[in-house]
């Protein structure tokens, strides 16, 4: 249409110019010839431009047909200069680097599988009966048969898998994480023939970040677990030593439990978190002696490492502050926090006609530091102290005891008393080339809390924790020193890495009561050697 308009305009302009020339007697013949020549040149130039425009239109139509492949569409056919900027932007969005060669995307969500295959060899100088996880509070004494037997295991059950799902939706950054291994509750004959180790879920949580706020829900490492960085739930940001032991290390408090956490990131360096976590009132296996008259009633109300019938009053509440230095200078992480826990029970008092319920609140404080003195060397430390928090110390000591209360000459009720306990872990870590070294010392302490059991028909009997004639499973302290070495044999960002993970540890445990002629301590030496393939 525009081509027709331009042609008509040129014809009319030419005719008008000729008419004016023939009617003007004063115009010179040379001027008329010059004007005609100029008009012819202009028409020729416009015809060239029209031909070029037609070629450009045909080229654009061909490209449009190739892109749409015959799909019906509405297109803007206006001729304009092509700009490469939008195409570049699309390429950058769709071709941004992936977290891992194994990552894949569905829409705007990225899925990243990971994990490792572990071939683990374990030697212990006494027969604990454990596999990848050491029962720190149950090391056999030298006056038992197990204390004179060594044990050796070869297993792949410490192998692990995980899946990270991440995406950004508007202003919301979402991360979902799933992690499992094969350290579940195995059958008693698991090592006989086929070694069918039980799969278990370690972690499964969803994390939402929006602005300065972060919310976490699911099963995760609790806030009492030491961090290396901020208050992050990511396993790589936690201080769990370099240990190969599935029970981590004596001195490291932790849980992996159902929880909800809110974190305020006040700045790039400072974070404050508040968490509610699944509770469990715990007395340990053969550690606490209940009053004789109430033993049958109290048994199902406290976890003795063998049941899940505990009543629990309300969730444990934990808060923690974390400060991290900037990118310049030494790498420093500092944290401090507090926790609150509760215990409760109900009994039918001796000589009473109605039930009696009792509860008590306990808690504690914690703190830690992770100091990078240089690029390849750091010092680490963490401690916790409180009452009613023994469960957090790898289930090695009790939370509370129940003692009798005389209400009359032959009538009794009962009440709660918390057990004081503490943990400490100190260490140094060094990285040189493909080698990582860790040196650690850790300990747990559990305060005695016993009473004269006036409900027992046998005079002079004591109950509670750590009293006279208490079992040697009532531990006063546990200690462990370790040297740990991880060597990377081969690593490729596309194919993963092959590592050798080693650990050499010495442990001791000391009970509160030592019978005449019995050993004062139980000792254990153990070594781990693992060949591990890590997915990229």
Mark where each language-model region is.
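Transmembrane beta-barrel strands of outer-membrane/channel proteins
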Residues: 115-123, 178-182, 217-221, 274-278, ...
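Outer-membrane beta-barrel "beta-signal"
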Residues: 522-536
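Detector for outer-membrane/organellar transmembrane beta-barrel domains
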Residues: 328-483
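Outer-membrane beta-barrel translocator domains and adjoining extracellular loop/strand segments
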Residues: 127-131, 187-197, 228-235, 283-305, ...
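Outer membrane beta-barrel
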Residues: 99-288, 313-328, 370-376, 380-391
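N-terminal periplasmic/intermembrane-space "pro-region" immediately following the signal or transit peptide
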Residues: 20-130
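Short sequence motifs at beta-strands and strand-loop junctions characteristic
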Residues: 150-156, 196-198, 250-254, 309-314, ...
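Bacterial N-terminal signal peptides that target proteins for export
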Residues: 1-8
């Amino acid at each position: 249409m525009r081509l027709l308009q331009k042609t008509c305009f040129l014809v009319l302009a030419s005719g008008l110019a000729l008419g004016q020339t023939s009617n003007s007697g004063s115009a010179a013949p040379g001027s008329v010839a010059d004007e005609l020549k100029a008009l012819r040149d202009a028409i020729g130039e416009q015809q060239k431009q029209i031909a070029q425009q037609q070629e450009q239109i045909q080229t654009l139509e061909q490209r449009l047909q190739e892109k749409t492949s015959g799909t019906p569409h509405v297109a803007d056919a206006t001729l304009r200069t092509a700009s490469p900027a939008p195409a570049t932007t699309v390429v950058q969005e769709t071709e941004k680097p992936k977290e891992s060669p194994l990552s894949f995307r569905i829409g705007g969500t990225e899925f990243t599988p990971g994990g490792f295959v572990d071939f683990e060899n374990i030697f212990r100088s006494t027969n604990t009966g454990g596999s990848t996880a050491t029962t720190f509070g149950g090391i056999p004494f030298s006056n038992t048969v197990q204390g004179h037997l060594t044990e050796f295991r070869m297993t792949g059950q410490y192998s692990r898998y995980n899946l990270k799902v991440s995406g950004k939706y508007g202003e919301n950054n979402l991360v979902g994480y799933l992690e499992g291994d094969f350290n579940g509750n195995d059958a008693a004959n698991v090592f006989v023939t086929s070694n069918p180790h039980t799969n278990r879920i370690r972690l499964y949580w969803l994390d939402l970040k929006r602005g300065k706020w972060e919310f976490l829900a699911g099963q995760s490492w609790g806030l009492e677990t030491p961090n290396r960085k901020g208050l992050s739930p990511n396993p790589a940001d936690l201080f769990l030593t370099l240990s190969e032991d599935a029970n981590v290390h004596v001195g490291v408090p932790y849980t992996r439990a159902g929880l909800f956490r809110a974190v305020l990131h006040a700045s790039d360096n400072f974070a404050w978190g508040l968490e509610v976590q699944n509770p469990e009132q715990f007395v340990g296996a053969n550690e606490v002696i209940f009053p004789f008259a109430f033993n049958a009633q109290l048994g199902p109300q406290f976890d003795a490492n063998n049941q899940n019938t505990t009543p629990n009053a309300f969730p444990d509440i934990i808060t923690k502050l974390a400060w991290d230095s900037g990118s310049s200078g030494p790498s420093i992480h500092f944290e401090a926090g507090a926790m609150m826990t509760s215990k409760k029970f109900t009994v039918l008092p001796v000589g009473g006609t109605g039930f009696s319920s009792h509860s008590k609140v306990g808690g504690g404080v914690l703190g830690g530091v992770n100091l990078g003195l240089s690029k390849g060397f750091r010092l680490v430390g963490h401690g916790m102290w409180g009452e009613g928090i023994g469960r957090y110390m790898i289930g090695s000591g009790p939370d509370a005891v129940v003692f009798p209360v005389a209400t009359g000459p032959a009538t009794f009720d009962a009440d709660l008393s918390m057990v004081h306990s503490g943990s400490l872990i100190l260490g140094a870590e060094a990285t040189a080339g493909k080698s990582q070294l860790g040196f650690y010392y850790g300990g747990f302490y559990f305060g005695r809390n016993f009473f004269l059991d006036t409900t027992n028909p046998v005079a002079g009997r004591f109950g509670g924790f750590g009293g006279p004639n208490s079992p040697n499973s009532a531990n006063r302290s546990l200690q462990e020193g370790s040297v740990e070495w991880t060597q990377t044999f081969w690593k490729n960002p596309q194919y993963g890495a092959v590592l050798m993970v080693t650990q050499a540890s010495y442990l001791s445990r000391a009970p509160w009561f030592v019978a005449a002629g019995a050993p004062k301590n139980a000792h254990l030496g153990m070594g781990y050697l693992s060949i591990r393939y890590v997915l990229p």
